[in-house]
Amino acid sequence: FLALNPQGLVPVLQADDLLLFQSPAILEWLEEVYPKNPLLPKDAAGRMQVRALSAMIGCDIHPLNNRRVLQYLRNELSVDEAEVIKWCNRWISEGFAALEKRLVADKTRGKFCYGDSPTFADCYLIPQVSSARRFEVDLNPYPNIVQIDAHCRTLKAFADADPMQQPDAPNA
């Protein structure tokens, strides 16, 4: 795998002779190559909104509770599991609180983070909600996030992509 991606991280997508890595780049590539199934709104303001929501999750929440960071906490700093869960809970909760406020204030929100069709933001959100559940985050303060998650999970693409359904899914 390191021959494909020297970082040793997912996602990596191989499309013919092209090797794609990093979620933002892969999503942008999909948007350009498969325009009939857009994940971004048509208007510039809508695209900005979706990218901003995506960045809130992908840049401000996820990096603090990704597998590599958690393994470092456990293995190098000898942080016990209860403290790891506390760490994740804190950072996910803080990020979700800000995201929930954005979703409440956004008049364009429909069934998804933006509008009535899936966007980049939903692609970022749903795996993070899985992490939140795994790390015992109380989701009650985030009803919009919970509603979006529930709706997305009715779609086959989201169900198939669930992190806990993957062959390398962590046990804890």
Predicted regions, residues:
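Carbohydrate-binding/catalytic loop surfaces
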Residues: 119, 166-172
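Active-site-flanking alpha-helical
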Residues: 31, 128-129, 162
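Phosphate-coordinating loops and pocket residues in cytosolic domains that bind phosphorylated ligands
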Residues: 3, 154, 163
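Short coil/turn segments at secondary-structure boundaries
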Residues: 66-67, 162-165
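GST-like fold's C-terminal all-alpha helical module
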Residues: 57-154
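GST-like domain detector, emphasizing the conserved glutathione-binding G-site
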Residues: 1-83
